Swiss-Prot record:
UniProt note: domains: Consists of three domains: the N-terminal catalytic domain, the editing domain and the C-terminal anticodon-binding domain.
Lineage: Bacteria, Bacillati, Actinomycetota, Actinomycetes, Mycobacteriales
SUPFAM superfamilies named in the record: Class II aaRS ABD-related (SSF52954), Class II aaRS and biotin synthetases (SSF55681), YbaK/ProRS associated domain (SSF55826)
The protein's Enzyme Commission number: 6.1.1.15
Protein name: Proline--tRNA ligase
Assembly description: Homodimer.
Disulphides: none
Length: 596
């Protein structure tokens, strides 16, 4: 197929868009692939849509290869199925809700577990129908509080979601592994650098869960890898190694001190060392102190009377050398929503003294206290004494205070012990491109799905859920592959295989370029032909670099000697070949083979 730039709906821009935050967003807009409609909502222009469709084709091929069958659900969905699973409430503000003219509640689908479960219940009733894997490539909607980075974090996006239904857990494991391998095939074919990480399930529910994270310095997800094993995990899923409990007997009594102007950990440590306080004969460090962070918890789960538990305060205890990681805290508290207490909360609760909050004061006022797993019995801490300019030294867990529970809320630091006991953790950044879950029977039980099993009894099938961010992959590939000159697309997803540029006004050169374009097209290559008559060679070259086709063929000054120039955008190579060798050289370059 041949597409002439003189006829292509395309406008490239020389300046970066004002709202762009990451390089891929800037280049996709400048190169005319996407255009912003509203925050987190984008239109796909011809070049961008071609990339998107190419990625969808790879995804469909790999899903079909594992026996999955494609269906399609609407994006506009009724409320009732999401009430059945509780997710109408659990999704909180992230859900787009609307009403029809009859005042009935609807939503724009963020994900479709409920619908897949319902359709399987309505169509199948015997174990002979199982296992089954269904998938769709569908537009999803989530009302992100802060949409950012263009199509990397949008409010409308395209996702491939698939669901497996099996009669037993062994079958679920097989379906899970099929998807795991299919995802590896997809991302390998797309040329993406990625890591497979243990993850939390969040509002999806279920047990086993893994994320596929594209490695990116500006990714919004932090993940860790062990220096001595294959362990990798999203930082939200890292489980703290719990130290052994310490003996309580014989420890000195806790002592309260006047600590003027010591609202920060840094100031508290400085005060302690100026007073000559020591810990096991050494100077006090930040890790010897205990931060007490006050949070608001909005819990949608129901109490014994069937009412939502609603909003309450809680205190989170973490060692003073670590910050509270809100993502880890949110993951630990699911499905509750959490946020830091604000000035109004402190004014409303005078027992909360900012900078001096401690676990004893919280417990005395009925506030739930959640501790980092390192706060084991017998550990001694310097922490707030619940009065301005006062701290307590030697407050011992299990003697002077007892947490109501434990929570993974402290930030993970470079060099922390690996949870598998092998080596230490190294931090990296990534962008989530895929997520696979072993959901179990959460949804099939909620919808009372009963299937006749081999023994003649009614059994509840088990589910898996598997997602790929299809539209996000466009941004991820752009982000990983771009260079200083523009986009660079791998051949598997590029809008066109070859970009032919006429850079010679000679009529014979123009005719030869047309003939070359037809030769390439007749051999099955997708060709973008820059035939614009009133555009200078310099502008054409700039556009060819910005647009990012894997191979650029220039019919320029060298044509007088029977030569054309090949520019490989992926390797950076530029070289001349005989005009008659342009086709085989182009095919070799697109296969990624080295020059002979």
């Amino acid at each position: 197929m041949i597409t002439r730039m003189s006829q292509l709906f395309l406008r490239t821009l020389r300046d970066d868009p004002a709202d762009a935050e990451v390089p891929s967003h800037k280049l996709l807009v400048r190169a005319g692939y996407i255009r912003r409609v509203a925050p987190g909502v984008y239109s796909w222009l011809p070049l961008g849509l071609r990339v998107l469709r190419n990625i969808e084709a790879v995804v469909r091929e790999e899903m079909n290869a594992i026996g999955a069958q494609e269906i399609s659900f609407p994006a506009l969905l009724p409320r009732e199925p999401y009430d059945t699973t509780g997710r109408w409430v659990e999704y909180g503000d992230a859900l787009f809700r609307l009403k029809d003219r009859k005042n009935a509640d609807y939503l724009l689908g963020p994900t479709h577990e409920e619908m897949f479960t319902s359709v399987v219940k309505s169509e199948y009733n015997s174990y002979k129908d199982f296992p089954v894997i269904l998938y769709q490539v569908q537009t999803k909607y989530r009302d992100e509080e802060r949409p950012r980075a263009g199509i990397l974090r949008g409010r409308e996006f395209i996702m491939k979601d698939s669901y497996s239904f099996n009669m037993d857990d062994e079958g679920l494991e097989e379906s899970y592994q099929l998807h795991r391998k299919a995802y590896q095939n997809i991302f390998d074919r797309l040329g993406i650098k990625y890591a497979i990480c243990s993850a939390t399930s969040g509002a999806m529910g279920g047990s086993a869960s893994e994320e596929f994270l594209a490695v990116a310095a500006n990714g919004e997800d932090t993940f860790v890898r062990s220096t001595e094993s294959d362990y990798a995990a999203n930082v939200e899923a890292v489980v703290t190694q719990v130290p052994p409990a310490q003996p309580i007997e014989g420890q000195p009594e806790a002592k309260e001190y006047e600590t003027p102007d010591s609202e920060t950990i840094e100031a508290l440590v400085e005060w302690a060392n100026s007073e000559g306080i020591t810990i096991d004969g050494r100077a006090v460090e930040a890790a010897d102190t205990l931060k007490c962070i006050v949070i608001k918890v909005n819990d949608p789960t129901l109490d014994e009377e069937g009412k939502p538990r609603g909003e309450s305060l809680a205190g989170v205890l973490v060692p003073g050398n670590r910050e509270v990681d809100m993502k880890r805290l949110e993951a630990s508290m699911e499905p509750a929503q959490v946020e830091l207490a604000d000035e109004a909360d402190f004014k409303k609760n005078p027992f909360l003294v900012k900078g001096y909050v401690g676990p004893k004061g919280l417990a005395a006022n009925g506030v739930r206290v959640l501790a980092d797993p390192r706060v084991v019995d017998g550990t001694s801490w310097i922490t707030g004494a619940d009065a301005k300019n006062r701290h307590v030294v030697g407050l011992v867990a299990g003697r002077d205070f007892t947490p109501d529970g434990f929570v993974e809320a402290a930030e993970v630091l470079e060099g922390d012990p690996s949870p598998d006991g092998k080596g230490t953790l190294a931090l990296a950044r990534g962008i989530e491109i895929g997520h696979i879950f072993q959901l179990g029977r959460k949804y099939t039980e909620a919808f009372d799905v009963k299937i006749l099993d081999e023994s003649g009894k009614r059994s509840v099938p088990t589910m898996g859920s598997y997602g790929v961010g299809v539209s996000r992959l466009v941004g991820v590939i752009a982000e990983q592959m771009l260079d200083d000159s523009g986009l660079r697309w791998p051949a598997s997803v590029a809008p066109f295989d070859v970009h032919v540029v006429i850079a010679n006004k000679d009529a014979a050169a123009g005719e030869a370029a047309v003939e070359l374009v037809e030769t390439l097209s007749n051999d099955g290559l997708e060709v973008l032909f820059d035939d614009r008559p009133k555009v200078s060679p310099g502008v054409k070259f700039k556009d060819s670099e910005l647009l990012g086709m894997p191979l650029v063929v220039v019919v320029g000054r060298g044509f007088a000697d029977g030569k054309v120039e090949l520019r490989n955008r992926l390797t950076g190579e530029t070289y001349e070949v005989d005009y008659t060798d342009a086709l085989p050289e182009a095919k070799r370059a697109l296969r990624g083979e080295a020059r002979p």
